[in-house]
Amino acid sequence: MNIYRRYGWELALAALLVLEIGLFGLSNSRMLDINVLLFSTSDFICIGIVALPLTMVIVSGGIDISFGSTIGLCSIFLGVMFQAGVPMSIAIPLTLLVGALCGLINAGLILYTGVNPLVITLGTMYLFGGSALLLSGISGATGYEGIGGFPTAFTDFANQTLLGLPVPLVIFMVCVLLFWLLMHRTHSGRNVFLIGQNSRVARYSALPVARTLCLLYALTGMASAIAAVLLVSYFGSARSDLGASFLMPAITAVVLGGANIYGGSGSILGTALAVLLVGYLQQGLQMIGTPNQISSALSGALLILVVVGRSISLHRHLIYEWLQRRRNTVV
């Protein structure tokens, strides 16, 4: 009973995931092939890598909508470093540092100005996106071509397997474990929840609010850089638009995973399951030949239905009391 009460939403998401795969399997048997299920994750799992630290940012009462532009900037930065003759063993760590720096810029501006994080990260979204386009233009990468010619060892990395699993999926699983430990088993993770519940009280309680927020936004930036490296390896090309489509799926996964958009509550495991739920929904709809427009609409409908269902489950006692009062009034 305690497990259900503590992980009830995660169990519900897991049940929905199994049901979703089963329903799509009735229309297309390939959806039930374990190899298809495993290797199709490479098409969407990078969204999950970014969604994990984004969960912690949202739980803290913040938001970061600049990560898509950060992915594009880190992607093209990696390509420019390679073009300049910098070894990949140096270019990749530098790319991770650029991602972390983008996150720290977000945190610094939010803390210094006191402006709503949505407004700040909206501005940095255009700043990082414009910087990516500038670098792309300087390097001569135009259109969808990007910067190619990377070493075979690098381009093969994201397409290889480790212990029978695709490398991007393995990296995602490691990230889930690390962020779960950070959020649910450390003092810093506890501080994240306290800051999200009431940041003013957290400051008066001498909690390290500034340091915690800097850590969260830096981790989101670094996760964006990791996603950029994996995407460049997977596609074999560095482009400034690689993260352009990540914004809504990542936020959808975080909210669907159980995070309160106003802060104070959330779950890393819930986000991880929601990433798979949304990702396999897109994959399944593609397999049965559903147009992209309808696919996006169904994803939005799923989010609304599940969030409404969660709201009802969280406030079921209030709904029951209201129904009882209505019944007594009628009688």
Curated annotation (Swiss-Prot):
Subunit structure as annotated in this protein's UniProt entry: The complex is composed of two ATP-binding proteins (LsrA), two transmembrane proteins (LsrC and LsrD) and a solute-binding protein (LsrB).
User: What the protein does?
Assistant: Part of the ABC transporter complex LsrABCD involved in autoinducer 2 (AI-2) import. Probably responsible for the translocation of the substrate across the membrane.
Q: Which GO terms describe its molecular function?
A: transmembrane transporter activity
**Organism lineage:** Bacteria, Pseudomonadati, Pseudomonadota, Gammaproteobacteria, Enterobacterales
Q: Which CDD domains match?
A: TM_PBP1_transp_AraH_like
Bilayer disposition of the protein: Multi-pass membrane protein
Please list every transmembrane segment annotated in the UniProt record, as residue ranges: 7-27, 45-65, 67-87, 90-110, 118-138, 162-182, 212-232, 240-260, 261-281, 288-308
Keywords attached to this entry: Cell inner membrane, Cell membrane, Membrane, Transmembrane, Transmembrane helix, Transport
Protein name in UniProt: Autoinducer 2 import system permease protein LsrD
- Quote a single Gene Ontology cellular component term: plasma membrane
UniProt-listed NCBIfam families: PRK15038.1
Q: Where does it mainly reside?
A: membrane
The places in or outside the cell where this protein is found are:
Cell inner membrane
